[in-house]
Amino acid sequence: MKLFPRSILITLVLSFALNLGIVTKIHAKDTLDSIVDILSGLTCETQGVGDLLRTEFSHTCIVAPFFTFAVMNLVSPVLYMNTFLKLKINDSDLFNDSNFGNFPGGQCTRENRIDPKNPELRFALCNNAKLIVSRAKSVAESALAIAKAVLTGSDPWDDIKTAWANKKKEYHVPYSGKPGDDGFAFDLGFPVIYWKVIQDKDRICVSTKGFTGDVPVGCKYMKEPFPKSMYNSFMDVADKDFIEDPNKTPTDPLALVSCSAAGDGCYQKAYNASKTAVVMTSPLIECMRQMIARLLISKDVCSFDNVSQVVNLVSRQDSVFFQFQVGMYKIVTAFLTLYVMFFGFKLLLAGEVPPKSEYINFILKMIFVTYFSIGINITPGNGSPYDRLDGMIQWAFPFLLDGINGLASWVMNAAPSGLCKFNNLSYDGTVSYIALWDALDCRVAHYLGLDILSTLLVENAYRSHDFLNFDFFSFSAPPYIYLLIPAIISGNMMLVSLALSYPLLVISVAAFMVNATIMCMISIVILGILAPLFVPMFLFAYTRNYFESWVKLMISFLLQPMVVVTFMITMFSVYDYGFYGKCQYKSKLIHNSIEDKIQGGITSKRDVLIFYINNDWDDTSQYPDKDAVESCQNSLGYMLNNPITTVFNFTKDSVSEIVGSKPGSTPTDKFLAKFQFLSGVVLGPGMFFMSPKVLFEKIKNILLALVMACFTLYLMYNFSSQLAEFAADMTEGVALNNVAIKPQAIFKAAMAVLATAGAATKGGDQIASRGGVGDLKAGQGGGASDLEVGKGGLPNDNIAASGGTSAPAVTTPTASSSVASSSPKTVSSEARSDVVTPPAPTEAVSPPPASIRTSISTLAPRVGKIIRDNNQESKKEIDNTPPSQEKVDNAAPQEKVDSTSKGTGVIDYSFNLKEHDNPTGVKQIRENAEIRDKRVKVEKAWNELVARGGGRVREQEGGEISERRANAEKAWDELVKSGVVTEKKDNSSNENS
């Protein structure tokens, strides 16, 4: 009120009253408009409200629904409204000169749209301080006009109207900016306006800050054809300067979207963005993220960063989440209606006015449930389901899915040695999450020795090194390789298993981390899709437990990967300290990866970050004291990776001590005791024997490191079995045991494969170590010679087959003069000799007193022999009385010569059944049947062996005995011992030279 004194106000009122009665109708109308203009122009805010009510929108060139302003005020409270009322873009009174910008006809005409070559937006902001000065000047001029009218009696209205004429340029501040430019507008009162120029597709907008980021306030279109849209990668517009890459003009319609098959695909995108030498896991995660984006948003987007491109388009109808939301519209509306009804009943029945906090909670619950379940419709009266603000798509899903990688990457980069530390700021914003998976791939490759070549090249070609220290020989070979090489050479599978235990555990834990992360992402997606079902349950106390359980599961799946990464970092840190001491790592960025060099560098050129041990011992930032340097130099990993450097440094230090010191008055023994090298070669007691001290100390350090590594491996192996349950208990969620592969399962499977390979190798060594003789030499000769056999003078044919063996000698049992007994029948045949027993020199067999003539026909040695039993033709006389001597003699089975056997090479002979003392005929028949079954089984095994070997199962050089032949021989011996077969084995064979 100090700027508007009471006298001035009285003067204004009197002037209006005096002129109100004397002006014409036209003056009356002009006076009314002037009063409204004056009242609406007292401040920038009131002027903005007046422009909004009486004219078209002055803050933007693009008309928006009025309800949009209310929604934007919720997203950006105070800031949006303050900027909205002061911003001027569509005002022809301002933008008509060089200071504000000369736009004939106004900024918003088609001819005055923004030039894509120079995307500069002109706008102005009202300033209350300048407005007060302008209004004070108008008041002073009006007072002078009234005073003049009083003194002269003239009409003051024209002068007053001139004093209050439009002077917008006096209290508006002009601004201009291109996308990315920002600044502050200072004015009286609060808040200070923050503005930023942004580009939204084919629009350039002035924005301010809000909860969701930059909130556009006023916008202006760019000229057509718009070249910077998502079609820029393929659209062939007239002006080639507008296209980023003129050579890239594909015609495939699928190229309309960046994640289509016409592009590089998810694997290539992740591979090109990765900065590790060996890429393993990041393509898998990228493909999973793209699949989730397509499933939840639209098939036309690959990332949640592109939500704004399709949030109001029909393409969202392909989204599973959108379809479920549409189906839940009526149900969520019913929940909200019931909530409003219950709240109204509560107010009516309470009998008193509830506190304001209860009203606020009521409104916030309504907004929360609508925003996160089905979305807020930002266009009143528009029934389109696409034009909505969706909290799950725009906020919840990006936060949860990005949070999985963000939280885990914080822990992954906390390694004390600096190994595999990737900064996500060095990545593009859309793929910054790959830093976590690059760190995982880098560590797995480092512990498995997959990056030996990369590190070796960096050591030689990319870093400034001192060749006096033999740095060119250093490489990052993991210690287990030095144990694996002799284990493989010696064939000791126990050493191989011990050497591979740690890399297998690393692989199993890394695989579990990838598996757990993917399962958590899928679980979050499933729970998120069900958000329209669970979020409305927050309204009522009876169903709120379901909502809280839903939220707990979401948070649990967000945190579980971080717990797994913490376990991995702990395991890796203990391993690093055990094998590498306090060694610190440095990194070098290579602009051409090794893979690209191998491929000729045609496909892509990506940056690769290589890590190697920092051997600059004077670097106090990483090695603050001498203990840290000695801890690294004496570590097992450093000595194995840098053997020549270790020997060279030790020799150099020892020689420098000797050369740099001169003997003085001190005794010789004390003088020599000062040198580490000389004192180190003195023999001293070791653990089991006398050894040089230096050698003993090194061996002791190596053994202690191995023991600690084994102990660490044991602890981590047992803890990994409970890792899933531990992560679930930490986050109060569901364990991933049943959906993710446990680390122990992978470890046990790999160790089982090693055990199987070891057993196979051991069995092969045992077979190879057995001795034997070669095949029998084939005899030559030809005809048959008859030999007299037995008392009866019956001849036995002995036929020498070509390339063959000795003819079998067959004896048949005869009865003695007093007791019925059976004499052994000896068969010395090629089939029996080759199948059952190893070849041996032939022994003569004495025939029994009584024998029958057996005819044996043979073919070529390659023809299989079939042993046929003709014992069925022989019959026993079964009687209840003991058999007489004559019956026993006649009961002896006779071997008959089959006419077909002579022409087919069939060997016919018979077996004796076991003689029984039991006179009962039924029991005799049963026992004979059992004996016959056993005999058939043995003969079948022989026939298979003979047929398989073509008449002879040949032995390998070195005397290898087949397992099947050994089994057949064992079965035959059991039958002989049991009396089923009374034939004695003849292992003899003739060898003709």
From Swiss-Prot:
Bias (Pro residues): 838-850
Superkingdom to which the source organism belongs: Bacteria
Transmembrane segments: 331-351, 359-379, 392-412, 494-514, 521-541, 554-574, 699-719
Family under the similarity heading: Belongs to the TrbL/VirB6 family.
Ranges of Low complexity composition bias in the record: 805-829
Topology with respect to the bilayer: Multi-pass membrane protein
The name this protein goes by in its record: Uncharacterized protein RC0142
Signal peptide stretch: 1-28
Annotated Basic and acidic residues bias: 866-879
InterPro entries: Conjugal_tfr_TrbL/VirB6
Compartment annotation: Cell membrane
Gene Ontology BP term (one): protein secretion by the type IV secretion system
